[in-house]
Amino acid sequence: MQILNPILPVMEDILGNLAELKASGKITNQQIDTVELQWYESERNILRKTSKSGREVAFRLLKEGQRLKHDDVVFVSESLVIAIEILPSEVIVLSPKTLPEMARACYEIGNKHSPLFLDGDEVTLPYDKPMFEWLQAAGFGPQKAERRLSQALRANSAQGHGHSHGHSHSHDHHGYHHHGDGNWHKH
Protein backbone atom coordinates (compact mmCIF):
# COMPACT_ATOMS: atom_id res chain seq x y z
CA MET A 1 0.00 0.00 0.00
CA GLN A 2 1.34 3.43 -0.97
CA ILE A 3 0.60 6.47 1.18
CA LEU A 4 -0.71 9.14 -1.18
CA ASN A 5 -0.54 12.09 1.20
CA PRO A 6 2.33 11.42 3.61
CA ILE A 7 2.82 13.59 6.68
CA LEU A 8 5.71 15.85 5.82
CA PRO A 9 8.24 17.32 8.24
CA VAL A 10 8.20 21.07 8.89
CA MET A 11 10.23 22.76 6.14
CA GLU A 12 13.13 24.58 7.84
CA ASP A 13 15.67 24.81 5.01
CA ILE A 14 15.88 25.75 1.36
CA LEU A 15 17.75 22.90 -0.34
CA GLY A 16 18.53 24.73 -3.59
CA ASN A 17 16.56 25.45 -6.74
CA LEU A 18 15.02 23.05 -9.23
CA ALA A 19 17.57 23.66 -12.00
CA GLU A 20 20.61 23.18 -9.71
CA LEU A 21 19.22 20.04 -8.08
CA LYS A 22 18.27 18.52 -11.45
CA ALA A 23 21.75 19.28 -12.82
CA SER A 24 23.39 17.68 -9.76
CA GLY A 25 21.27 14.52 -10.09
CA LYS A 26 19.41 14.98 -6.78
CA ILE A 27 16.16 15.38 -8.69
CA THR A 28 15.60 12.73 -11.33
CA ASN A 29 12.19 11.14 -11.82
CA GLN A 30 10.46 12.14 -8.56
CA GLN A 31 7.00 13.68 -8.61
CA ILE A 32 7.33 17.47 -8.33
CA ASP A 33 4.63 19.09 -6.23
CA THR A 34 4.49 22.86 -5.90
CA VAL A 35 3.37 25.28 -3.22
CA GLU A 36 2.00 28.50 -4.69
CA LEU A 37 2.83 31.72 -2.85
CA GLN A 38 2.00 35.36 -3.34
CA TRP A 39 5.12 37.56 -3.26
CA TYR A 40 4.37 38.86 0.23
CA GLU A 41 3.95 35.30 1.60
CA SER A 42 7.52 34.47 0.54
CA GLU A 43 8.72 36.94 3.19
CA ARG A 44 7.04 35.13 6.08
CA ASN A 45 9.11 33.01 8.47
CA ILE A 46 6.27 30.76 9.60
CA LEU A 47 3.65 29.69 7.10
CA ARG A 48 1.25 26.81 6.41
CA LYS A 49 0.03 26.20 2.86
CA THR A 50 -1.57 23.46 0.78
CA SER A 51 0.37 22.24 -2.26
CA LYS A 52 -1.18 21.87 -5.72
CA SER A 53 -1.74 18.16 -5.04
CA GLY A 54 -3.37 18.80 -1.65
CA ARG A 55 -0.48 18.19 0.77
CA GLU A 56 -0.32 20.33 3.92
CA VAL A 57 3.11 21.97 4.02
CA ALA A 58 4.38 23.91 7.04
CA PHE A 59 7.36 26.28 6.90
CA ARG A 60 9.54 27.51 9.75
CA LEU A 61 12.37 29.48 8.16
CA LEU A 62 14.18 31.11 11.07
CA LYS A 63 17.69 31.62 9.67
CA GLU A 64 18.65 35.24 9.00
CA GLY A 65 17.97 36.26 5.39
CA GLN A 66 16.15 33.01 4.55
CA ARG A 67 13.43 33.96 2.03
CA LEU A 68 11.57 31.71 -0.38
CA LYS A 69 12.10 32.36 -4.10
CA HIS A 70 10.53 30.94 -7.24
CA ASP A 71 11.72 27.35 -7.93
CA ASP A 72 13.26 26.92 -4.45
CA VAL A 73 13.16 23.29 -3.32
CA VAL A 74 12.23 22.64 0.30
CA PHE A 75 11.82 18.84 0.30
CA VAL A 76 13.40 15.95 -1.62
CA SER A 77 12.75 12.22 -1.13
CA GLU A 78 13.06 9.18 -3.39
CA SER A 79 9.55 9.78 -4.71
CA LEU A 80 8.69 13.44 -4.06
CA VAL A 81 10.05 16.96 -4.49
CA ILE A 82 8.32 20.02 -3.09
CA ALA A 83 9.16 23.30 -4.81
CA ILE A 84 7.98 26.89 -4.49
CA GLU A 85 6.05 28.77 -7.16
CA ILE A 86 5.87 32.53 -6.66
CA LEU A 87 2.75 33.61 -8.51
CA PRO A 88 3.04 36.50 -10.96
CA SER A 89 1.29 39.69 -9.87
CA GLU A 90 0.64 43.17 -11.25
CA VAL A 91 3.75 45.28 -10.88
CA ILE A 92 5.22 48.64 -11.77
CA VAL A 93 8.44 48.33 -13.78
CA LEU A 94 11.10 51.05 -13.89
CA SER A 95 14.09 50.92 -16.22
CA PRO A 96 16.51 53.60 -14.99
CA LYS A 97 19.11 54.52 -17.60
CA THR A 98 21.80 55.84 -15.22
CA LEU A 99 23.00 55.12 -11.70
CA PRO A 100 21.84 58.55 -10.41
CA GLU A 101 18.39 57.91 -11.92
CA MET A 102 18.32 54.48 -10.22
CA ALA A 103 19.35 56.02 -6.89
CA ARG A 104 16.71 58.75 -7.14
CA ALA A 105 13.96 56.27 -8.06
CA CYS A 106 14.85 53.91 -5.20
CA TYR A 107 15.13 56.79 -2.73
CA GLU A 108 11.75 58.26 -3.67
CA ILE A 109 9.97 54.90 -3.68
CA GLY A 110 11.61 53.89 -0.40
CA ASN A 111 10.52 57.19 1.12
CA LYS A 112 6.95 56.09 0.36
CA HIS A 113 7.66 52.75 2.11
CA SER A 114 6.85 50.55 -0.86
CA PRO A 115 8.74 47.25 -1.14
CA LEU A 116 11.30 47.23 -4.00
CA PHE A 117 12.51 44.31 -6.09
CA LEU A 118 15.32 43.89 -8.62
CA ASP A 119 14.64 42.11 -11.90
CA GLY A 120 17.82 42.27 -13.97
CA ASP A 121 18.50 45.97 -14.63
CA GLU A 122 14.94 46.92 -13.74
CA VAL A 123 13.30 47.91 -10.48
CA THR A 124 9.85 46.48 -9.80
CA LEU A 125 7.30 47.12 -7.09
CA PRO A 126 3.74 45.95 -6.41
CA TYR A 127 1.26 47.80 -8.62
CA ASP A 128 -0.54 50.68 -6.97
CA LYS A 129 -2.39 53.23 -9.11
CA PRO A 130 -1.46 56.34 -7.05
CA MET A 131 2.21 55.26 -7.01
CA PHE A 132 2.11 54.59 -10.78
CA GLU A 133 0.65 58.04 -11.44
CA TRP A 134 3.18 59.70 -9.13
CA LEU A 135 6.07 57.93 -10.91
CA GLN A 136 4.68 59.08 -14.27
CA ALA A 137 4.41 62.68 -13.08
CA ALA A 138 7.96 62.52 -11.67
CA GLY A 139 9.27 61.46 -15.11
CA PHE A 140 10.35 57.89 -14.27
CA GLY A 141 8.45 56.33 -17.21
CA PRO A 142 6.83 53.45 -15.30
CA GLN A 143 5.34 50.46 -17.11
CA LYS A 144 2.64 48.10 -15.84
CA ALA A 145 3.35 44.36 -16.18
CA GLU A 146 2.77 40.87 -14.74
CA ARG A 147 5.90 39.54 -13.01
CA ARG A 148 7.09 37.40 -10.16
CA LEU A 149 8.39 39.52 -7.29
CA SER A 150 11.15 37.58 -5.56
CA GLN A 151 14.43 39.54 -5.35
CA ALA A 152 13.55 42.07 -2.65
CA LEU A 153 15.92 44.90 -1.86
CA ARG A 154 16.54 45.18 1.86
CA ALA A 155 17.70 48.12 3.92
CA ASN A 156 18.00 47.83 7.68
CA SER A 157 15.80 44.71 7.61
CA ALA A 158 16.99 43.73 11.09
CA GLN A 159 15.75 47.10 12.34
CA GLY A 160 12.16 46.42 11.36
CA HIS A 161 9.97 49.14 9.89
CA GLY A 162 10.04 52.06 12.25
CA HIS A 163 11.62 55.46 12.32
CA SER A 164 10.91 58.92 13.57
CA HIS A 165 11.42 62.40 12.21
CA GLY A 166 10.98 65.87 13.60
CA HIS A 167 7.67 65.86 11.72
CA SER A 168 4.87 63.45 10.94
CA HIS A 169 3.50 62.21 7.66
CA SER A 170 1.25 59.49 6.33
CA HIS A 171 2.70 56.05 5.90
CA ASP A 172 0.43 54.66 3.21
CA HIS A 173 1.50 51.13 2.34
CA HIS A 174 -1.08 50.60 -0.41
CA GLY A 175 -2.94 47.84 1.43
CA TYR A 176 0.19 45.93 2.49
CA HIS A 177 1.29 45.92 6.10
CA HIS A 178 3.21 43.91 8.67
CA HIS A 179 2.85 43.24 12.37
CA GLY A 180 6.18 44.68 13.52
CA ASP A 181 8.20 41.82 12.04
CA GLY A 182 8.97 43.29 8.59
CA ASN A 183 6.91 40.59 6.82
CA TRP A 184 4.60 42.39 4.37
CA HIS A 185 1.16 41.00 3.50
CA LYS A 186 -2.45 41.93 2.76
CA HIS A 187 -5.57 40.69 4.52
Swiss-Prot record:
HAMAP family: UreE
Subcellular location(s) per record: Cytoplasm
Biased composition (Basic and acidic residues): 178-187
Chief location category: cytoplasm
Name by which UniProt lists this protein: Urease accessory protein UreE
Function summary: Involved in urease metallocenter assembly. Binds nickel. Probably functions as a nickel donor during metallocenter assembly.
Compositionally biased intervals (Basic residues): 162-177
GO CC annotation: cytoplasm
Keyword terms of this UniProt record: Chaperone, Cytoplasm, Nickel, Nickel insertion
GO biological process, one term: urea metabolic process
UniProt xrefs under Gene3D superfamilies: Urease metallochaperone UreE, N-terminal domain, UreE, C-terminal domain
Disordered, as annotated region: 154-187
Domain of life: Bacteria
Family note: Belongs to the UreE family.
InterPro entries, sorted: UreE, UreE_C_dom, UreE_N, UreE_N_sf
SMART domains: UreE_N
Gene Ontology terms for molecular function: nickel cation binding; unfolded protein binding
CDD domains named among the record's database cross-references: UreE (cd00571)
UniProt-listed Pfam families: UreE_C, UreE_N
